Structure formats: C-alpha cells, structure tokens
Swiss-Prot record:
Keywords, sorted A to Z: ATP-binding, Ligase, Nucleotide-binding, Protein biosynthesis
Protein name, as recorded: Aspartyl/glutamyl-tRNA(Asn/Gln) amidotransferase subunit B
PROSITE patterns: GATB (PS01234)
Top class in the EC scheme: ligase
Length: 499
C-alpha cells in the first residue's frame, strides 16, 4: 500500500544538518487498554495491580481445548472510540492469528485483526502552539485504522540471577491499536497528538490513559528526508510510555538518522528501544514485516458482524467531546482558545469549570481555575478530583469579589485559607474580619497621611504619573490590603493632581 504525503514542507519544522536541511516524518501506533471488567476472550479480571498470575484463566494460559469467547463490551468500546475519532466503522471485521514465539505469549500467537479491522480511516485535529504571536496552528492527523487485539503477558528478568519469570495477568487483556498516518512533522506535533488521543479516550471512558501503568503506550515510527523528497527508511521505537519521552525519543532518533545519512551511511529498518536514563534510542532487533508473522484468520472465531443500528445506538450515547466543548467555551463564554484548550485537557477539569461558571462570568472563572486552582494542584501534585476547594467554595470566593465584599488580593488569601483549612468562604470572611474597607472617608484619611509624609515623591509623581502606583501600594499596605483598590486608585490620582 502506497503512503500519501499529506503535508507541504514547512521550514519551521526543518532540522539543520551539516549538509543542509532535513525533515522528520512521524507516525504512531498507540496501544490503548480497553476499560472492561474482563479480558478480550476470557472472563478473567482485567484489573491492574494484582499479585502475579492471579488474573489468569485457562484460556489466557493457553490450556489445550480452551476456546476464546469474544467480550461484547470490548467491541462496544472499540466502536465508541472509532466514532470519537470520526472514523469509518466496519460492520464486518475478522480476527487473525499473528504468529510469533515469546515466553509471555503462551499460545504462540496473538489474536489480532490484520486484513479487516473493526475501525477504518478517521482523523484527529491537534493544536500546536502558541507561537510568538500567541497563535495556534490546527493540524489534521489521519487515523489509518483501529483494531482489536490481545495484550501479551510480562516477562520479568530482575527477580532471579539465573532465571526469568512470567506474569500472565496482562495476557489476553483487550487492546485497541490505533494507527496514525505519517502526518506529523515535529516532536511537538507528536506530543500534541498523544495528548489529544489520550484526552479523547478518557472523555469516552474507553481507556484510562494511565501511561505509567502501561494502559496506554506508543510505538513511534521515525524517518528523515530532504524536504520534498520521498519518505525515508523508518525505524520503530517500541513501547514509549510517557508523552515527555515520546518527544525526547523523536529528537534523538531524528538526529541519529541525519548523522548516519550525512556520513554517507544507510538507515536500516529496525525496531529500537528508548533509554529514558540516557535519553537515547538503541537497537533492539531488525524490523519484522507482515509476512514474518504469517497472519491467517483465526479458525476458532467467526467474523465479527453487527448492523448499522448497533453503531447508531452507540453514537447517540456519546458524551460531548473536547473539541466541541472547547468551541462552546470560546463561543458562549468568550474564552480565549488558549484558556479553553487548557480547561478541556481533562474531563474532570472541564466539569469543575462549568459548575463554577454557571451563572457567573466565564472569563473570571477561567482565570481562577487555570491560575489559582490548577496552579495549587500542580504545586501539591494532586489531581482535580482531590481538590480541597470545591466548585461551590470557589464560586463563593468569586461572588464575594463581585459583590465588593472582598478585594482581589483578599480573595487570594481567602483561597489559601480554604485550600489549607476548608470552611465556608463567607463565614471565614465574617469571622476573620476580612471584608474590604469601602468607607471613602476612611480610605481618604489613609491617602492623605501617605501623601503628607512623602512630599518629595508627590513632586516626582507630577512629572512621572506612573509613581501613583507606589502611593496605591503604600495605602493598601497601611490598610492591611483591605481598602477597595479602585477607590484607592481614584483618590490617589485626585490628591496628586494627575489624570
């Protein structure tokens, strides 16, 4: 099958070599573990983290005479994912045996889909940026296919000095292999693609996307070429398990290939591993072709067939996906594309934001959620589900500002109190006398005192109006940050005689 080049060479993606510019070409095969109680062809639990070999059925262990029975929930999840990727759903697909020997593959073959996958071509729109002008670039990355397959077990080589052990808990767990087209031209695009794909499957509830647990991992295909020339020979970097490592692996591998070609060498098609400690890729084995696996239809499984009504019923029940939510946030709440993009990265964040924003100014709420809430969560290494500040509490803080009860500065202090101690924000403001001073005469007395004690700066302020900010700061300090900032600003300018 010929590969179509969908992108026009763009100099901002070129990599400078000794002999001229090069372009990196990237495609990805992502293995996403399906959220399901049981495995693809057996009733054994698919739950992560059990003691070795506790979630193994006779089918998973490949005992003689054991026949696979397809898990319908896994089929539903694959179709839902395909719909989320705007892909063609194939009403008929076929399971094949992919034959190879490895200790953690007790059958001697993997049940996969080669010729007739359950999902055909689709697409993902990724946003890369912002650039120096604050603009984002939307890029379409094609999806070639999505197919169902079994995961293998896990070989462990560090448990004994002379023996290796095998854990079959993962053997037979349902995977979706999502294959992109070679449409990415930089490590940033590849990271954005993986981030977006993970976000989509999490919104759909078809994969938890926990890369640290191995439930989502990527095989990254990298090649380089002179801009405008045919695709070069690709190398596959296997099982990269973090978005940061995907970027590092691509950067290293592209430079490695360029160095070889500029020295007059040839790129060998091979499978490589990424060493996260050294930040480099190293050779694993020569890359297999499809014929090496001797694919043929699995005689124990009938072709998988369903009707359009089955697909339509699943489509009708899909949740609102991140692109649609982002567009709604921009259109209905007036958010910037940047802010909306941050808020939809996780469904829980979008849900939190919407709960706080209901009946309030979306821009103000977005500012608090992105800068204060997410900043505090990141500092404490917590997920939003663990936030000590609930949507109701944050909403109350924002309401207190709007009502003029507290200033923005006091609100920051109040947020910190609620974060560390909990409690009702309104009650805290009353009990701790945190209300801002709105009495104009009291504020005016404070302004008069600061002006009277700083005659030299008053004269300077008439020449440099920006010095008014210093006076505002001194008044706020004198009032313990409780004076209404707008009133202070107006009175300072009036007393200094500046516009």
């Amino acid at each position: 099958m010929s590969i179509i080049d969908t992108r026009t060479p763009d100099s901002k993606h070129f990599i400078s070599g000794v002999t001229g510019d090069w372009e990196v070409i990237i495609g990805m095969e992502v293995h996403a573990q399906i959220i399901s109680n049981s495995k693809l062809f057996s009733g054994a639990s698919a739950k992560f983290g059990a003691e070795p070999n506790n979630h193994v059925s006779l089918i998973d262990a490949a005992m003689p005479g054991m026949l696979p029975v397809l898990n319908e929930e896994c089929v539903r999840q694959a179709v839902r994912t395909g719909l989320g990727l705007k892909a063609r759903i194939n009403l008929k697909s076929v399971f094949d045996r992919k034959n190879y020997f490895y200790p953690d593959l007790p059958q001697g073959y993997q049940i996969s889909q080669f010729h007739y996958p359950i999902v055909g071509e689709g697409k993902i729109i990724i946003s890369v940026g912002p650039d120096s002008n604050g603009q984002f670039e939307d890029i379409e990355v094609g999806i070639e296919r999505l197919h169902l397959e079994q995961d293998a077990g896990k070989s462990m080589h560090d448990q004994h000095p002379t023996m290796s052990f095998v854990d079959l808990n993962r053997s037979g767990v349902a995977l979706m292999e999502i294959v992109s087209k070679p449409d990415m031209r930089s490590s940033d695009e590849a990271k954005a693609y993986m981030t977006k794909l993970r976000t989509i499957v999490r919104y759909l509830g078809t994969c938890d996307g926990n890369m640290d647990e191995g439930s989502m991992r990527a095989d990254v295909n990298v090649s380089v070429r002179r801009p405008g020339e045919d695709f070069g020979t690709r190398c596959e970097i296997k099982n990269v398990n973090s978005i940061r490592f995907i970027g590092q692996a691509i950067e290293y591998e592209a430079r490695r290939q360029i160095a070889i070609l500029e020295d007059g060498g040839v790129i060998e098609q091979e499978t490589r591993l990424f060493d996260a400690t050294k930040g480099e890729t190293r050779s694993m084995r020569s890359k297999e072709e499809a014929h090496d696996y001797r694919y043929f239809p699995d005689p124990d499984l009938l072709p998988l067939e369903f009707d359009q009504a089955f697909v339509d019923s699943l489509a009708a029940d899909l949740p609102e996906l991140p692109d649609a939510i982002k567009a709604r946030f921009v259109k209905e709440m007036g958010l910037t594309v940047y802010d909306a993009s941050i808020l939809v990265t996780e469904k829980a964040i979008a849900d939190y934001f919407e709960e706080v924003a209901y009946g309030r100014d979306g821009k103000i709420v977005a500012n608090w959620v992105i800068n204060d809430l997410l900043g505090a969560l990141n500092k404490d290494n917590r997920e939003i589900e663990e936030s000590p500040v609930s949507p109701n509490q944050l909403g109350s803080i924002i309401d207190l500002i709007k009502e003029g009860t507290i200033s923005g500065k006091i609100a920051k202090d109040l947020f910190e109190i609620v974060w560390n101690e909990g409690g009702d924000p309104r009650q805290i403001v009353e009990e701790r006398s945190m209300k801002q001073v709105t009495d104009t005469k009291a504020i005016e007395r404070a302004v008069d005192e600061i002006v009277a004690n700083n005659a030299d700066k008053v004269a300077q302020a008439k020449q440099k109006p920006a010095l008014a900010g210093w006076f505002v700061g001194q008044v706020m300090k004198a009032t313990g940050g409780k004076a209404n900032p707008q009133t202070v600003n107006e009175l300072v300018k009036m007393k200094l005689g500046i516009d």
